[in-house]
Structures are given as structure tokens and as C-alpha cells.
Amino acid sequence: AENWPRFVLPSPALGIADRIRRHTAAGRPVWLYGHNMGGGFAVAVQEQAAAGLAPAASPDAALALHDNPERVKAQGVSITPSCPKGYAAVPLADYEPGFWDGLLSAAGLPKPSLVVAAAQDHGHHPEGNRVGRFNLWRALLTETQGDPARWLYDTSPTPCTRLNALQQCTGGPVADTATAAVLGALAAPEVAKRSQRQGVTVVNVGNSHVAAFLVFKGRILGVYEHHTGMLDTDALLFDLKEFGFGWLPDEQVRAKGGHGCAFLAPLPPEAEGFAPTFAVGPRREMLLGYAQFIAPHGDM
């Protein structure tokens, strides 16, 4: 697919990290407030704490650092509902309407009538993000019986605290980023047609996480998720082959640092091991020569 115009911008978390670092350099402690969002600015917060500036956060903003308030405090961050005197207030949000309205206005474009957004959400799980996130996948797979159309939420599930916050800002449907990847892949004609004849594997090789899906006749029959930095090509290929036959134990994935894997059992034999593999994502070169690279709607 060609000629799909888009804005490609740094993530909101990177912009927030830059603001925090500028305040740190100026000797100003920050108070984070606003919404739960992606925690890519956490290192900048830790740097400020290490500099002795005692960063703070509102209860909602603290969720972007960890679900467990004690873990947030252990990072040197105090939790307070109002901005302490002498602190610089830094707002948090995955989607800030004023920014987007300004950007579109500067480009001479109208405001959208609908905003559809995706974010990675581990759910509210104080004991750890890995456990919480894969519990969400397992429940989603079972409750929807693998119907991908139901993975796009008109109303985000209560445990999905980041998607809840995102939807408060956008007012439109939301989804997990891995869901967006597999739905995009299924919009590619070659994937849709092939998956009607035999099972296929769709792999999203992201900067931080690898997510793989077993797809057959319009249904998702398996989900696998791991950390990209913990895998090389051989390890990923081994996991994908075992995953395709339903042989990969969830415990094995978690023991090696991944999130886990889950299936709608039994996998149909006519899916033939889900051997054809289609890859998307910024790190898809890990599967160069082993998967067909696709770019649904122009996005890889």
C-alpha cells in the first residue's frame, strides 16, 4: 500500500522525559499530574531522584510508573494530590487534544470527527506488569473466542487503566498496540486469503516486545508475547515453531523472561502448524528470510 499520509512523531513519553531532564538540569523538582500513560519517562524521573531533587506525582500519574504505590515511593517519588511549593508541574497524557488541535491547525487540516487510538496496556496488577498483561491476553482470547473484531473496544475494560485514561482523552475506540498490529495484518489481502486456507502466524516485532498470533479462518487461536531484547533470531524462531504446534508451555516463556503464551485448545490439525509467517514492526529484520514482511495501509 502506498500514499497513506501520516504524522510520525516522537512518543509523548519522550517529550515528557525531555521536560523532566530540563527541570533537573535547572535544579527544579517536578510534580507529575494528569493521566496514566506510557512510562517511557521513568528513567528521567529516576535521574531526578538520584540528583536529590525528590520528584513527586499525583495518585493517577503515579500509575504510569507502577501500579503499586510502594514501588513508586521506592523509586524516590512521593505521592501527593497537589503540587508542592517550588515544584514544576508536568502534565501526563498519551493524547493531549490541545497539542493535536494545534498541529492539525498549523497544517491546515480540520479536527477529526473520530479519534481511534492504541496503546500498550498491562492492566492494573500491583504484583507486576508481566503477570497483569498476560492475564489480560488470556481473558481476551477466551471471552471473545478469538474474534479479533471484539478486540477493538468501544469502552475499554476496567482493568485496562492506561486505555481507560486514553479513552477519557480521545472519546473514541481504543485498542492495544499488539491488537492494532494483528488487525492491520488481517487487513492485508495476502494474509486474509492465506489464513482462510491454512493457519498463519502474525508477528509484531516491536522495539520492546514481540507479540505473535496464530490466525485461522478469521479467528485468533493463540497469543505469545516476549521482550525483544531477550531474544535473538534463533530463540524467536524456536519459540514460534513450538508455538505454532501448540507445544510451547506458558511456564517456559515466563521462565525465560517473557510474558507468556496461551491457546484456544485444541488447535485444529488443518491449520498445519501455522507455518506461513507474516512480520510487521520496527524490529522485523530479526525474521529476515524467515517471514514475509508486510506493510498494512503503508505501515510496517
Label every model-predicted segment:
Residues 1, 195-217:
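Gly/Thr-rich phosphate-binding beta-strand-loop-beta motif of the actin/hexokinase/Hsp70
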Residues 112, 209, 219-221, 274:
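A broad structural signal for short, well-ordered beta-strand segments within beta-sheet-rich domains
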Residues 213-245, 252:
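A beta-strand-loop signature enriched in Asp, Gly, Thr, and Trp
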